[in-house]
Amino acid sequence: MSILSALTSISNPMKSSKSSVANGGGRLSMGSNSVACGSCGGGSSSSGTINNADGSKTTYYTYTSPIYTYNYSYSYSSSGSSSSCGCH
């Protein structure tokens, strides 16, 4: 499975959706994408960051129950991250 399809495939939006970015030593670019996580309750929020090769950090998603919003374009070399929306 490619990184892009791993990030964008969601089998059931009422279950926990997970995303991961593996070390690919390359560039990944996306526009924006919002998906409903569903049944998470109110007031929950989080965000995920990528550690860039130059030491900076890039926020690659924000989550405010029940919506995940991806909006990013970044390059990376040896860093990765994974996250889940926290629905149980």
UniProtKB/Swiss-Prot annotation:
Any Gene Ontology biological process: sorocarp development
Regions of compositional bias (Polar residues) in chain numbering: 1-14
Annotated Pfam families: Coiled
Superkingdom as given in the UniProt entry: Eukaryota
InterPro entries in UniProt: HssA/B-like_chaperone, HssA/B-related
Ranges for region Disordered: 1-26
Similarity comment text for this entry: Belongs to the hssA/B family.
Alphabetical list of PANTHER family matching this protein: HSSA/B-LIKE PROTEIN 1-RELATED-RELATED, HSSA_B-LIKE PROTEIN 1-RELATED
Protein name: HssA/B-like protein 9
Species of origin: Dictyostelium discoideum
